[in-house]
C-alpha cells in the first residue's frame, strides 16, 4: 500500500536503472565467488575464468544481485536520485 502511494513500482526502465542492476549483479558474483565455501558442484559453467563456480552458485549470486539491485533502485528513487 505504501509502495503504490509513493509510486515506486511505476518507474520506467532507463539506463541508470540498468547500470545499477548490472553493478549489483557483478558485485554479488564477486562476493559470492570468494565467500561460498562449498562450491564447484555439478553442473559446471563453461567459462574458464570461473573455475569451481557452477550453476547453483551462479543462480544464488544472481538472485542476491537482483535483490540488492531492486532495493537500491527503490531506495534511490525514494531519495529522488533517480529521475526520468
Curated annotation (Swiss-Prot):
One Pfam family of this chain: PSI_PSAK
Secretion signal span: none
Classification via PROSITE patterns: PHOTOSYSTEM_I_PSAGK
Subcellular location as annotated: Plastid, Chloroplast thylakoid membrane
UniProt key word Transmembrane helix: yes
Keyword Chloroplast: yes
A single GO cellular-component term on record: photosystem I
Domain of life: Eukaryota
Gene3D superfamilies reported for this sequence: Photosystem I PsaK, reaction centre
Main localization category: plastid
Keywords per UniProt: Chloroplast, Membrane, Photosynthesis, Photosystem I, Plastid, Thylakoid, Transmembrane, Transmembrane helix
Recorded topology in the membrane: Multi-pass membrane protein
Ranges annotated as spanning the membrane: 12-32, 54-74
Family: Belongs to the PsaG/PsaK family.
Protein name: Photosystem I reaction center subunit PsaK
Lineage of origin: Eukaryota, Rhodophyta, Bangiophyceae, Cyanidiales, Cyanidiaceae
Gene: psaK
Amino acid at each position: 500500500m505504501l509502495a503504490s502511494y509513493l509510486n515506486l513500482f511505476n518507474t520506467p526502465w532507463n539506463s541508470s536503472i540498468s547500470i545499477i542492476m548490472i553493478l549489483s549483479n557483478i558485485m554479488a558474483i564477486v562476493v559470492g565467488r570468494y565467500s561460498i565455501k562449498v562450491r564447484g558442484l555439478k553442473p559446471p559453467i563453461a567459462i574458464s575464468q570461473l573455475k569451481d563456480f557452477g550453476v547453483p552458485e551462479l543462480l544464488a549470486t544472481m538472485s542476491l544481485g537482483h535483490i540488492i539491485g531492486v532495493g537500491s533502485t527503490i531506495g534511490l528513487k525514494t531519495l529522488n536520485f533517480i529521475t526520468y
